[in-house]
């Protein structure tokens, strides 16, 4: 759990990739500049991890539990392959049936939405999984740490998702320009599913931390099957149809997914709903306030101004509801402190 080293490796490898890409482009490498950028980033990351890790491979030794580790890793790799297939099939289908233009709108909307959500979920996952693994023999501490982490995830992602739903047009126009306006509908529909997606993603924490990757592959494959089905159901209606059906499946499957992941732990529905309830209600309240504001200002101010004012109102109303009406200010501050303390002590 040397997160400072990991952060330094990620930042430095990204910088190496950027420099290589720029230099390659200056020397007229064309599209190969992009290839070289990604390759150099991966190579720099590998070198950084190798230098930062004290362990070195040696000769194989019998009787050290390799078989169980291979089973754990094999199931985890299997889930990653299946999940990767599902995450990319929508692009393949839309491009094949509706062409490059529709694929461009869909892909741009999806990537724009996922960018901020990943910046929240990825660091939390990097901290939560090893911490939970250390706590798996202490059921109550495991449960408390997971629920606190889940609450923090939803605290940040719920208002962000609702903000994207309400001000999708303004976001697309301000960030991408009017030529991408057709992507706003897809962006809005995907953002609806993004309300539940970060919650469902934490199910993976429970599976991995408790060594139940076989169940992760089993139930994850069911979820992938539902997602793939949603793509085919929505495909006749273009990118909007795929986005709508995908979000519906995410909203519906998240709850069985959480049930299967939590049933071998002390995490229960009362705890889950308690962790996510106030942030979701606060985000919905703030979303309604921004929706009213958008209706009043849409035809009087530029899109960027509506976006800026909407962000201020969203944040103010959300914090007012969660911190003061629900009285959660002290609890969230203490949660952040305890997560940081648990993460450091479990190292």
Residue ranges and their predicted role:
Residues 4, 31, 47-92, 102, ...:
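Interhelical loop/hinge segments that connect adjacent transmembrane helices in multipass membrane
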Residues 9-21, 34-51, 79, 83, ...:
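Short runs within selected transmembrane alpha-helices of multi-pass transporters and secretion channels
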Residues 19, 23, 27, 146-198, ...:
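Alpha-helical transmembrane segments of multi-pass membrane transport and lipid-handling proteins
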Residues 25, 84-115, 130-134, 164-179, ...:
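Helix-terminus/linker motif at the lipid-water interface of multi-pass membrane proteins
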Residues 31, 67-79, 94-114, 143-145, ...:
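Interfacial/gating helices of multi-pass transporter permease domains
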Residues 75, 90-92, 102-121, 148-155, ...:
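Alpha-helical transmembrane segments of polytopic membrane transporters and translocases
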Residues 109, 113-157, 204-209:
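Helix-loop junctions and terminal segments of transmembrane helices
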Residues 259-269, 290-347:
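Membrane-proximal transmembrane or re-entrant/amphipathic helices at the cytosolic face
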């Amino acid at each position: 759990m040397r997160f400072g080293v990991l952060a330094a490796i990620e930042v430095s490898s990204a910088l190496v990739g950027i420099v290589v890409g720029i230099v390659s482009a200056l020397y007229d490498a064309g599209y190969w500049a992009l290839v070289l950028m990604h390759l150099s980033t991966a190579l720099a990351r590998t070198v950084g991890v190798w230098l930062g890790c004290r362990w070195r491979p040696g000769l194989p030794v019998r009787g050290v539990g390799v078989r169980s580790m291979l089973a754990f890793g094999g199931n985890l790799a299997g889930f990653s392959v299946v999940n990767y297939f599902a995450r990319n099939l929508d692009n393949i289908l839309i491009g094949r049936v509706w062409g490059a233009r529709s694929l461009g709108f869909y892909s741009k909307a999806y990537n724009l939405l996922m960018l901020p959500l990943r910046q929240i979920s990825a660091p939390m996952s990097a901290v939560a999984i090893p911490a939970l693994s250390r706590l798996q023999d202490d059921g109550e501490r495991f449960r408390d740490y997971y629920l606190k982490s889940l609450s923090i995830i939803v605290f940040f992602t719920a208002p962000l998702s609702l903000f994207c739903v309400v001000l999708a047009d303004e976001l697309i126009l301000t960030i991408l320009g009017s030529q991408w306006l057709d992507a706003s509908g897809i962006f809005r529909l995907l953002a609806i599913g993004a309300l539940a997606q970060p919650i469902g993603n934490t199910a993976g924490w429970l599976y991995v931390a408790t060594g139940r990757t076989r169940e992760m592959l089993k139930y994850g494959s069911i979820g992938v099957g539902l997602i793939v089905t949603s793509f085919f159901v929505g495909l006749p209606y273009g990118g909007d149809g795929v986005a709508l059906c995908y979000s519906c499946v995410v909203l519906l499957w998240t709850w069985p997914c959480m049930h299967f992941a939590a049933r071998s732990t002390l995490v229960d529905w009362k705890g889950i709903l308690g962790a996510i309830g106030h942030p979701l209600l606060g985000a919905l309240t703030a979303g309604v306030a921004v929706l009213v504001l958008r209706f009043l200002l849409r035809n009087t101010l530029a899109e960027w101004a509506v976006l800026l004012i909407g962000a201020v109102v969203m944040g103010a109303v959300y914090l007012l509801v969660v911190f003061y009406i629900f009285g959660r200010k002290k609890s969230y501050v203490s949660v952040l402190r305890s997560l940081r303390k648990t993460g450091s002590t479990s190292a």
